[in-house]
Amino acid sequence: MASEEASLRALESLMTEFFHDCTTNERKREIEELLNNFAQQVGAWRFCLYFLSSTRNDYVMMYSLTVFENLINKMWLGVPSQDKMEIRSCLPKLLLAHHKTLPYFIRNKLCKVIVDIGRQDWPMFYHDFFTNILQLIQSPVTTPLGLIMLKTTSEELACPREDLSVARKEELRKLLLDQVQTVLGLLTGILETVWDKHSVTAATPPPSPTSGESGDLLSNLLQSPSSAKLLHQPIPILDVESEYVCSLALECLAHLFSWIPLSASITPSLLTTIFHFARFGCDTRARKMASVNGSSQNCVLGQERGRLGVLAMSCINELMSKNCVPMEFEEYLLRMFQQTFYLLQKITKDNNAHTVKSRLEELDESYIEKFTDFLRLFVSVHLRRIESYSQFPVVEFLTLLFKYTFHQPTHEGYFSCLDIWTLFLDYLTSKIKSRLGDKEAVLNRYEDALVLLLTEVLNRIQFRYNQAQLEELDDETLDDDQQTEWQRYLRQSLEVVAKVMELLPTHAFSTLFPVLQDNLEVYLGLQQFVVTSGSGHRLNITAENDCRRLHCSLRDLSSLLQAVGRLAEYFIGDVFAARFNDALTVVERLVKVTLYGSQIKLYNIETAVPSVLKPDLIDVHAQSLAALQAYSHWLAQYCGEAHRQNTQQFVTLISTTMDAITPLISTKVQDKLLLSACHLLVSLATTVRPVFLISIPAVQKVFNSIIDASAQRLTDKAQVLVCRALSNTLLLPWPNLPESEQQWPLRSINHASLISALSRDYHSLKPSATAPQRKVPLGDTKVIIHQTLSVLEDIVENISGESTKSRQICYQSLQESVQVSLALFPAFIHQSDVTDEMLSFFLTLFRGLRVQMGVPFTEQIIQTFLNMFTREQLAESILHEGSTGCRVVEKFLKILQVVVQEPGQVFKPFLPSIIALCMEQVYPIIAERPSPDVKAELFELLFRTLHHNWRYFFKSTVLASVQRGIAEEQMENEPQFSAIMQAFGQSFLQPDIHLFKQNLFYLETLNTKQKLYHKKIFRTTMLFQFVNVLLQVLVHKSHDLLQEEIGIAIYNMASVDFDGFFAAFLPEFLTSCDGVDANQKNVLGRNFKMDRDLPSFTQNVHRLVNDLRYYRLCNDSLPPGTVKL
């Protein structure tokens, strides 16, 4: 014993040293090694058993339990049966003896270790494992311990990790399912007993039927008077011990509900009991009493009571989240909803002492979250099922949800509730779309609720009604979606407004427009307060209160303009004529507002509070332009109608809009406003396309300022947008006009002069015989290249999907710039930032204008690139120039992707050199690099080469297929095909999961479209190599997220030759597996059934993989020299 005693003292001092602040990392590593070596010794567990019973040192106990855990989970197979019996007997005794005094985390760990033994040995060698747990639960002294054991068993045995064979996993699940009814009965009994015991002693008399608690909805919601009566019982006050037992029982239930199927085992009495406990969460009295009585003990009690409510709601939500509900369980669900809505009514009850919001503020935040989760699950999963029950009052439910939503104490809570309304509105919309006949009935039923929702959501986004809350929202920090908290708040609110508009267009419009009108009056009335001062114009509103009111009104106007813009889509298409007048009213107001803002130059005005009011004025102006832009599709439809009726009204709208835009296209205007004006101009030119646009003086003014060499250039983004608008005005066909009236010759001349002016400086960079290259500093040259190519690339990109005529004119204007680019390219091959921009430009040209460029010139470009990208140049770009260099190579490969996809024979002569470039120059550089750069693009190019040029490799003739019945194609260029396949195979051995997924998809696509796996060369030389690699990937768990895709791919490959797979490949694969013995290999082979359907086959694959890993784990854990029988 002395040695055990000495070891314990040594271990305690080592542990104390290890966790001491002054211990160096070096020394910690030494101690760690020492402890690991100790744990590996045969029989180390005996020392640990002594340590556990003899020490009070937490670190030592934790270490000892870790040794046991390792022994049971990794080495159990090799432990002599006598030792196992001793461990199975000693650890539970230790737990029983010390569970009251052990720290909770040690006790829980010891429970887990005992459950781990059960996972391995129950019921065969540890037959009383589960009965022991049931006995612990039934004995009042050990109930908490039994519940902890039960929860741990549910966690570890119902969904065990992969260190068990599939057969054992299935056996454990079945064993547990057999116990479910007993366990649920026990848990129900515990909860009911505690409740009943404390209900009897509750001091508060039950409320009379007429008192405030009996809500007016109860008669509807609760059909059975007995459950109503039960729910009216006062909530008992529990002692600490009972509180603890109930929380453990509810935790057990929540975990059990996560995996057991919905069935009759879940009895009505269990559900009612859970709801009793859910009431603890909405009991504000307990909190009040705790705070009145003041003692910390009482405060803890208040929190614990709240926690019981949270746990009970977790149980309810576990049941709610199950989409598949057996018929016999539907009635239970209905009862659950009724009981939950009783709770919802209770927490949204408004009486003198409490406003709803203050009541919600008093509740535990987690309880509110759980309750909101319940409501979300109810609407998203069960509403369609429940709505048809006549006894379920959906409209009353919406009334409660409305109160609950608009009294949420936090912004996050409000967002979550808006999500629920969005789900409800989506449900209504899809219901109406699927059953058009019921539209009126559905809308009549919900109309009042929707109008109320719309009004309240609109009030919530206005500072006029909600300033205190809105001021709290952050409008500076961007989240992951690149929006601020305020923008997110506004966007989510406007989505709800838009969904109501879709269902009730007239109501929505008549609710929103007057509110917009009120705020517009304030804005349009500002003109009377503008006075001229020495330095310009000033807004003569200075009183602090007036400034604050103006600030609120401007913020609201900005939000309402966004709302009006969001609704634009509900005025077009089939309803254009019916809602024409409403839309015209909106558009006329918007045009008036934008013109007003531009004329009195509110964006440049001096104000009393410049840091607040100036951004407000700029924002309103920008939002009015953006809202008008949202109506561009409506204007386009109006343009079509106006063309037939030749209406002056439409011409005036467009001309006035241009008068509003033109003053803003200037370097003196703030970026936000400038870009809004540019975007509106682009929409007019691209979407509306009025014939007279180019002849409007305001547009000609913009055109002249852009081609004027002396004019100051706009910022990059604005310049690109304005040039796009002008180019589209000249290039896009006018709607509703025949080809003969399109005025192409005149438009072509104008377009050429526009492009010529834009690329003037760029052309001057090209060296010629008469004028050798001007010495422009490199920095300036780069600026010229960037400015010109960004504009030209954008112009091409925007024309690429248009008519042939538009593309022809575009290419005629650009021809010289393209030739200049090709001439300059070699000079900048070592400047990766310039090459990157040039290749972007060429890529856009190839995608949009390759037909117009013509074959000879396209060939010249491709040849130039192939000559420039030598192996040395590629290596320099990829290896030494970082991300820009890689981007250059990726763009070059993208250009080649466009080339290999071109139908017809034109570019076929390039295939050999493109494949050679890929396989001999790019692939060797990137194959072994861990970085994913360039790989995705290279493999996409290889895939497109195969997919679009299949006959380059497989020559199939009609005659051959007629003669043989099945064409066994002639194979050509076999070495190249094999090299490409080899590269795909290699890519599956690399860690990058995105590349793996992409390449697996490419192979599967080639099989679907071209029968790749059936081709003789693939079938005979590659098929089972690929299957082998994919199986190994599954075994190594390196790409676990793709398990399903890999399983399907293995099936598709194996199905080409099932006989070969079962008879030759599988035995061979098992023979080559290391870490398993012959007997285990036989079992693995026998368990792989010869099923040939996809679900069974993939199930067999995953079973094989799981069991192979399990056997290896077992064998690794056996002590050396173990004899296996």
UniProtKB/Swiss-Prot annotation:
Official protein name in the record: Exportin-6
Taxonomic classification: Eukaryota, Metazoa, Chordata, Craniata, Vertebrata
Main location: nucleus
Phosphoserine carried by residues: 199, 208, 224
CC terms in the record's Gene Ontology section: cytosol; nucleolus; nucleoplasm; plasma membrane; protein-containing complex
Keywords: Acetylation, Cytoplasm, Nucleus, Phosphoprotein, Protein transport, Transport
Cross-referenced InterPro entries: ARM-like, ARM-type_fold, Exportin-1/Importin-b-like, Importin-beta_N, XPO6
Positions of transmembrane segments: none
UniProt-annotated location(s): Nucleus; Cytoplasm
PTM-bearing positions, type N-acetylalanine: 2
Similarity-based family: Belongs to the exportin family.
Record's keyword annotation contains Protein transport: yes
A single MF term (Gene Ontology): nuclear export signal receptor activity
Modification Phosphothreonine occurs at: 201, 204
Gene: Xpo6
Entries under Pfam families matching the protein: IBN_N, Xpo1
Species for this entry: Mus musculus (Mouse)
Residue ranges occupied by any Importin N-terminal domain in the UniProt entry: 31-97
